[in-house]
Each structure stands twice: as structure tokens, then as C-alpha cells.
UniProtKB/Swiss-Prot annotation:
Cofactor (UniProt): [4Fe-4S] cluster
Disulfide bonds: 134-380
Protein name from the UniProt record: Dual-specificity RNA methyltransferase RlmN
Amino acids binding [4Fe-4S] cluster: 141, 145, 148
Subcellular location: Cytoplasm
UniProt catalytic activity: adenosine(2503) in 23S rRNA + 2 reduced [2Fe-2S]-[ferredoxin] + 2 S-adenosyl-L-methionine = 2-methyladenosine(2503) in 23S rRNA + 5'-deoxyadenosine + L-methionine + 2 oxidized [2Fe-2S]-[ferredoxin] + S-adenosyl-L-homocysteine; adenosine(37) in tRNA + 2 reduced [2Fe-2S]-[ferredoxin] + 2 S-adenosyl-L-methionine = 2-methyladenosine(37) in tRNA + 5'-deoxyadenosine + L-methionine + 2 oxidized [2Fe-2S]-[ferredoxin] + S-adenosyl-L-homocysteine
A GO BP entry: rRNA base methylation
Catalytic residues, chain numbering: 121, 380
Length: 406
């Protein structure tokens, strides 16, 4: 049972066992589960049924031990336990923000013996009527966006689909978000509906479209109605603009799309989002106009971080409106979230409101995203795995900046 933590920006070690040495079946798709069963001698004629049983227990019921699988024969349960586990990534640190946001630092199993395990972060953002889980797709990031903390951490590797799905399993474990489990209680958690994790956003560490195969496979697992059952309209993939993969994502997978735009001129976006040098704004916008999954009912979200004196003028707002012509879009204005060492500042609220008003009067929804989890470095642009630890001085600086931004 999950014992809810009191809201605090202080990190605490989570009471989770060390990583299993047996390969885990948690996070695998049906094909890989079938191969795992074949490897321990399950006859081919039984495999489809057994895969369906495993799928039900792992993804619908949240089983963490094969002994829980009461409709699976005792002999097979024993075989499974001898060769496999249902282990999740190790929770190294769990933090709870004053606003109820939760962040988990997760340690992944080493890919090869003797290799140093890598770490990623996942963030749960609760609201009254929903709970959004922000998942990572890479260890580190290669894009080096000027305002993003994750971009200061070098890219190590892509995550596997199983490692992406496992982030969702960890969150649901900790929140008691399975049928028959005692749900977590605490400040900010959803009070409506029967699920605590209702939406998934690929907005954590990494560029999802540079880990396309893993992300696509993970989405199919997450959306499967016999398991986790998170429909694709509740799954959003955010990209900084890997243009060749955008059409492919819409055609093959079909999730909601978000674009990390942040500038309306190539010269500025080249600085803020360096991938723009390879795929400039005109190419990016054309990919958005032809995105197969887009419609008035499934609008593309354009994320725009508000940087004081950089991209926040009325002229920028009008240029943004012009840029979005012909695209079913909404604009998400994001107050810049501070992190130690950054040279940028957040636009003041009057400037943000003027910018939002110009966009809104042009017919586009332009909500200003409420900063969540700033005090635990869980807000947009602040994620960076603790393998690259902040110094005490940097943490004090962060808290001062977060307090000043309130």
C-alpha cells in the first residue's frame, strides 16, 4: 500500500527493493511476452491464452508477483518466477511538491553486466478532474535547447518501450491506481473519476521522435483497451521539430501532437531550439498542416515558453497568430521555470496576459500553464537526472528563484 507523503520539496529515499537480476516482463508487448513464454517451454497452442492472462495481470491489475495470478496454473507461475520477474525500475528518490506534484527519480537496470545503471525522471501532475504523467523517452537529450535544464545533460541512450511503459506502472503502483487497490490520498490528487493517471505526455527527458520506435511501441501498449486502456486522445507526444518523423507518427500511431515552438523567427529559434537549423519553421509548420491525426477535435498544441525581453512582445504574438493560419491549433503559454545557471528570466504577468489576449482575440485558445513542481525541479524544462547532481549552492539558488517567481 502506498503511504502518502506529506507535501515537501525535500527529497526522500523511497522504500523500494533493489533491481531484480531476473529479466522483467513488466512493460513488454504481446509479441515479447509470447517469446518469453516460448523460452520456458510453453506450448505454442497455449501461448495466446497465456499472453492474454499475463497482459490482464500486468497491465489491468498491476501485479508485481506471479503468485497474484490466480487463474494461471501453479506450475506455470513457478516456472515464470524461476526465470522472470515483474520488477519495475528502482525508485531512488520520490519528491512531493507543495502543490501535490510528484517526481520520481528512477534507476534503470544496466543493459550489460558491469555497466553503470542510468536514471530518468517521471513527473505526476494532479488536478481535480485528471492526473497527467509526464514520461521520459531518453536518458539525457541531444537537442541543447537554450532554456531547458535537460538539454545540459548529454544524451546517453534511448529508452526501450518497456522502460517507458514501466514509468507508468511505477506511478500507478505508488498511487494505488488499480482496481481493488487502496488509492493514495493527499493534497491535489484528483477527486473525480475512477483513475488517478488519466493522461500521458511525452514531455520528460529527451526528444521522443529521436526514440521513435520505442515511443510508438509504448503508445500501443498504453492504449490497449485490455490493459492500461489510455486512449490515444489522452496521449500526447511533444517534439522540438523532428520534421521527417511527424507525418510518420500521425500515420502509424496517431497520438495527440505538441510542438515545442518558442519562437516565430528562424534567427531566434535557431538559438532557443537549435534543431531549427536543420528543420526551419516553414518546414515544421508544413508538417503540422499535413499531420494525419490533426482535426478541429484533435488540435495540435504549440508550446511557447515566455522569456522576458526575448520572445514576449506584442509583435511576437501577432506573428504567432499569422504563423498558425491553416493549422487546427491551441497555444500553451508557459511561464519560464528557473534553474541554476540559466541566463533567462520569466516574462512578467502583465506581459504574458497581453500576449495571451492577442492570441485569444485571433480565435486561438491560449491558456497560460500554471507552473507545477517548481520547488522540486519538476516543472517544464527543469528535468535533469540526479546522476548529475546539483550542488547545495545551486539548490539554494533554485529555491530563491522559485520563490521570486511566485
Amino acid at each position: 500500500m502506498y503511504a502518502p507523503m506529506m507535501p515537501s520539496p525535500t527529497a526522500v529515499a523511497a522504500p523500494v527493493a533493489a533491481l531484480s537480476i531476473l529479466p522483467s516482463l513488466a512493460g513488454l508487448d504481446r509479441e515479447k511476452l509470447g517469446l518469453a513464454l516460448a523460452a520456458i517451454g510453453v506450448p505454442e497452442r497455449e501461448r495466446k491464452m497465456r499472453v492474454n492472462q499475463l497482459w490482464h495481470w500486468i497491465y489491468l491489475r498491476g501485479a508485481t508477483d506471479f503468485a497474484e495470478m490466480t487463474n494461471v496454473s501453479k506450475t506455470l507461475r513457478t516456472q515464470l518466477a524461476e526465470h522472470y520477474s515483474l520488477a519495475r525500475p528502482e525508485i531512488v528518490v520520490e519528491q512531493v511538491s507543495q502543490d501535490g506534484t510528484r517526481k520520481w527519480l528512477l534507476r534503470l537496470p544496466a543493459e550489460t553486466p558491469g555497466e553503470r545503471p542510468h536514471e530518468v525522471e517521471a513527473v505526476y501532475i494532479p488536478e481535480r478532474d485528471r492526473g497527467t504523467l509526464c514520461v521520459s523517452s531518453q536518458v539525457g537529450c541531444t537537442l541543447n535547447c537554450a532554456f531547458c535544464h535537460t538539454g545540459t545533460q548529454r544524451l546517453v541512450r534511448n529508452l526501450t518501450a518497456a522502460e517507458i511503459v514501466a514509468q507508468v506502472l511505477v506511478a500507478r503502483d505508488r498511487l494505488g491506481d488499480y482496481p481493488g487497490r487502496e488509492r493514495a490520498v493527499g493534497p491535489g490528487l484528483p477527486t473525480e473519476g475512477d483513475r488517478l493517471v488519466t493522461n500521458i505526455v511525452f514531455m520528460g527527458m529527451g526528444e521522443p521522435l529521436y526514440a521513435y520506435d520505442s515511443v510508438a511501441e509504448a503508445i500501443e501498449i498504453l492504449a490497449d483497451g485490455d490493459g492500461l486502456g489510455l486512449g490515444k486522445r489522452r496521449i500526447t507526444v511533444s517534439t522540438s521539430g523532428v520534421v521527417p518523423e511527424i507525418e510518420k507518427l500521425g500515420r502509424e500511431v496517431g497520438p495527440m501532437l505538441a510542438i515545442s515552438l518558442h519562437a516565430v523567427r528562424d534567427d531566434l529559434r535557431d538559438v532557443l531550439v537549435p534543431i531549427n537549423k536543420k528543420y526551419p519553421i516553414a518546414e515544421l509548420m508544413e508538417a503540422c498542416r499535413t499531420y494525419p491525426a490533426a482535426s478541429n477535435a484533435k488540435r495540435i498544441t504549440f508550446e511557447y515558453v515566455m522569456l522576458k525581453g526575448v520572445n514576449d512582445s506584442p509583435a511576437d504574438a501577432r506573428a504567432l497568430v499569422k504563423l498558425l493560419e491553416g493549422v487546427p491549433a491551441k497555444i500553451n503559454l508557459i511561464p519560464f521555470n528557473p534553474w541554476p545557471g540559466t541566463k533567462y528570466e520569466c516574462s512578467d504577468w502583465e506581459t504574458i496576459e497581453k500576449f495571451s489576449d492577442i492570441v485569444f482575440r485571433a480565435g486561438y485558445a491560449s491558456p497560460v500553464r500554471t507552473p507545477r513542481g517548481r520547488d522540486i525541479l519538476a516543472a517544464c524544462g527543469q528535468l535533469k537526472s540526479e546522476t548529475e547532481k546539483l550542488s547545495a549552492r545551486e539548490r539554494l539558488a533554485l529555491r530563491a528563484m522559485a520563490a521570486a517567481a511566485e
